[in-house]
């Protein structure tokens, strides 16, 4: 497959308990997460030139190794010695720094895309295992749905689906880094 389009779905936390801080700086949590149909559009195209080219519609987003989508592509392409390259175009719609896993969902979508585009044969579980090395929400974004997350967010238990409903998401004109919030706890 030389081209594909993917939807990187956002998520909301229906409940979040922070249980304690680990020595490595991560926090033990118990939370219920729900996928929402607000998504970033990701287009991927195989290229003959080795490497990763990342483009985005938001000028202030990094398009290098500081971007989780780039890191996800780099992780699998290095591990599996992919000789070709990939061009990733990211059209952001999930609010940035809103706690909706925008970066993590982009990484999950790119993991799925690289796996499929280059026929790597990884299972969902294997993608989730690699995803946790990129961020605690990435395994959830690979799994999606209504899920109880424990540990640092990587121990996932599917729950019965929430009833279909409309959700109003209001994002004020300020941004809050999830990483910084957890560091302050």
Sequence positions of predicted segments:
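ATP-dependent small-molecule kinase catalytic core of the GHMP/sugar-kinase superfamily
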Residues: 2-7, 11, 15-31, 120-185
């Amino acid at each position: 497959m030389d081209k594909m389009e993917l939807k990187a779905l956002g998520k909301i936390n229906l409940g979040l308990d922070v249980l304690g801080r680990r020595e490595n700086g991560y926090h033990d949590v118990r939370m219920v997460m729900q996928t929402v149909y607000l998504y970033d559009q990701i287009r991927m195209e195989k290229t003959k030139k080795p490497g990763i080219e990342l483009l985005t519609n938001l000028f202030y987003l990094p398009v290098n190794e500081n971007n989780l989508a780039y890191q996800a592509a780099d992780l699998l392409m290095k591990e599996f010695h992919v000789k070709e390259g990939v061009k990733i175009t990211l059209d952001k719609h999930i609010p940035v720094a809103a706690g909706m896993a925008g970066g993590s969902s982009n990484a999950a979508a790119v993991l799925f895309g690289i796996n499929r585009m280059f026929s790597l044969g990884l299972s969902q579980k294997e993608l989730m295992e690699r995803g946790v090395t990129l961020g605690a929400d990435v395994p959830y974004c690979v799994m999606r749905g209504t899920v109880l997350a424990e540990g640092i967010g990587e121990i996932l238990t599917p729950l019965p689906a929430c009833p279909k409903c409309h959700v109003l998401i209001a994002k004020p004109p300020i941004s809050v880094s999830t990483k910084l919030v957890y560091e302050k706890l």
